[in-house]
Amino acid sequence: MEQGSGRLEDFPVNVFSVTPYTPSTADIQVSDDDKAGATLLFSGIFLGLVGITFTVMGWIKYQGVSHFEWTQLLGPVLLSVGVTFILIAVCKFKMLSCQLCKESEERVPDSEQTPGGPSFVFTGINQPITFHGATVVQYIPPPYGSPEPMGINTSYLQSVVSPCGLITSGGAAAAMSSPPQYYTIYPQDNSAFVVDEGCLSFTDGGNHRPNPDVDQLEETQLEEEACACFSPPPYEEIYSLPR
């Protein structure tokens, strides 16, 4: 367990939270609608002032000078056009709306776009991963080279292993949570494998006898007897999987 915890500590993963950036009103680019509304508003104000001026000049100077008669017609026309532009800018583009209405309308899209929570960034892996406003649960699998498989009792294995076979008890096998690994029961330096190698060397050394047919029959019988006695049992007999 100490080695496993040490390997987990060696895995470098840095997690830090990042507060989401809320764009200010200065960073928001002016849209085309705002430009058109502002243009209509100032044009309407200018035309309205010119229309008022022409109307006043026509009514004042009309009595003495006859060439100011056109101002009485042009002044009201310019004034009506200017008022129309102002109404379009106010009603359609909302250029003169109240400040509280604007703030309430700006808060609704910001609350919809802004994630509701901090952001978590993982930087100790191949590619950084960022989670916005979500509950992050980190899971690191255990290392593969653990000293002992989980759920295997070494004293139980030592008590049931014998040179020519394995004696299992039903209660102990049922109590195990997971099947034992084959290499833990029969390692490479087991006596069964050593005897098998001795049998193979013995059969190789007996190939120089004068009668090959009789020697092959005897060697085959000896090899079958030795393998039947010292070879490890199959995995299905060691641990039967539940059906």
Swiss-Prot record:
GO terms for biological process: phosphate ion homeostasis. It is found in: Endoplasmic reticulum membrane; Apical cell membrane. It holds the Pfam family TMEM174. Keywords: Cell membrane, Endoplasmic reticulum, Membrane, Transmembrane, Transmembrane helix. The keyword Endoplasmic reticulum applies. It comes from the Eukaryota. The chain crosses the membrane at residues 40-60, 73-93. GO terms for cellular component: apical plasma membrane; endoplasmic reticulum membrane. It is a multi-pass membrane protein. Predominantly expressed in kidney. Selectively localized in the apical membrane of renal proximal tubule epithelial cells. Regulator of plasma phosphate homeostasis. Decreases serum inorganic phosphate (Pi) uptake by regulating the sodium-phosphate cotransporter SLC34A1 trafficking by PTH and FGF23 in the kidney. Interacts with SLC34A1; regulates SLC34A1 internalization by PTH and FGF23. This is Transmembrane protein 174. It comes from Homo sapiens (Human). The gene is TMEM174.
